[in-house]
């Protein structure tokens, strides 16, 4: 099955502590998990590594979030949208279901 949410897509969070926030997909880990820029921030306790001259401390980083908790953001309507697939010139492309506009 083709991925409905891909890298560099702008998405909006539907549920959880970051509900309503928007961000860009940085990395797709699997079919069900992605990392979104500035969303689902967690604090990681990091030990110092003297060999690499790396200080220790508490570091904030993005954790993975389930794709089911996200929706693609349609800039034309300013809302979350659903994704469909169709063939254009022999190629499978994604489109927004609300206005049938092709996703770039």
Curated annotation (Swiss-Prot):
One annotated GO molecular function: rRNA binding
Q: Which residues form a coiled coil?
A: none
Query: Listed GO cellular component terms?
Result: ribonucleoprotein complex; ribosome
> Which Gene Ontology biological process is one annotated for this entry?
translation
- Span-the-membrane segments of this chain are none
Q: Which keywords annotate this record?
A: Ribonucleoprotein, Ribosomal protein, RNA-binding, rRNA-binding
What S-S linkages are listed for this chain? Answer: none
- Summarize the protein's role: One of two assembly initiator proteins, it binds directly to the 5'-end of the 23S rRNA, where it nucleates assembly of the 50S subunit. One of the proteins that surrounds the polypeptide exit tunnel on the outside of the subunit.
Q: Which family does it belong to?
A: Belongs to the universal ribosomal protein uL24 family.
Q: Which NCBIfam families does the annotation name?
A: rplX_bact
Give the quaternary structure.
Part of the 50S ribosomal subunit.
Name of this chain's protein: Large ribosomal subunit protein uL24
Q: Which organism is it from?
A: Pectobacterium atrosepticum (strain SCRI 1043 / ATCC BAA-672) (Erwinia carotovora subsp. atroseptica)
């Amino acid at each position: 099955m083709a991925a409905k949410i891909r890298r560099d897509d702008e998405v909006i969070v539907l549920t959880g502590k970051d509900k309503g926030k928007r961000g860009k997909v940085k990395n797709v880990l699997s079919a069900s998990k992605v990392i979104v820029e500035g969303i689902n921030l967690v604090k990681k306790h990091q030990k110092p590594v003297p060999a690499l001259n790396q200080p220790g401390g508490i570091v904030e980083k993005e954790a993975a979030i389930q794709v089911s908790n996200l929706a693609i953001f349609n800039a034309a309507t300013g809302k979350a949208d659903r994704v469909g697939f169709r063939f254009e010139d022999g190629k499978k492309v994604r489109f927004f279901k609300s206005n049938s506009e092709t996703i770039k």
